[in-house]
């Protein structure tokens, strides 16, 4: 399910978010053949909109590409377990599956039973964790 290409795009998007002073979270939506349909990172600061989380932006981009808000037959891979707001948008979009890499240490997310935690090569998990840690450490 999770290819090297997907992991690289997720990491690259997290790095872009970090350097743009955004929380380094990214999301990808893939079709049933694992083709990337959309990918985004958080842009709350950049766009000055509280709702511009990676998950929501990826859903909007995918919906625009396929011409339908219903994302049946598509799956999302996100670097951090989605927050409550994103969880509700994900449910409304009708994605078939949502996979996440990291648990959230920084805020309470909904029950993770709605989503599937996936194991990725340790190097990716460590890099993603490091970006989040650096981001939040630099905020203080």
Where are these regions (language model features)?
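A short, polar/charged loop-to-alpha-helix boundary motif
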Residues: 46-56
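Glycine/small-residue-rich phosphate/adenosyl-binding loop
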Residues: 38, 55-64
């Amino acid at each position: 399910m999770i290819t090297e290409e997907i992991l690289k795009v997720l990491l690259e998007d997290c790095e872009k978010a970090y350097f743009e002073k955004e929380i380094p979270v990214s999301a990808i939506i893939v079709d049933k053949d694992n083709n990337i349909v959309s990918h985004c990172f958080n842009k709350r600061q950049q766009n000055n909109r509280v709702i511009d989380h990676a998950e929501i932006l990826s859903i909007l981009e995918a919906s625009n590409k396929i011409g339908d808000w219903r994302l049946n037959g598509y799956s999302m891979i996100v670097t951090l377990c989605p927050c409550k707001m994103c969880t509700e948008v994900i449910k409304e979009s009708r994605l078939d599956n949502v996979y996440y890499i990291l648990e959230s240490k920084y805020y309470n997310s909904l029950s993770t039973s709605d989503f599937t935690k996936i194991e990725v090569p340790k190097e990716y998990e460590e890099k993603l964790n490091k970006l989040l840690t650096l981001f939040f450490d630099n905020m203080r």
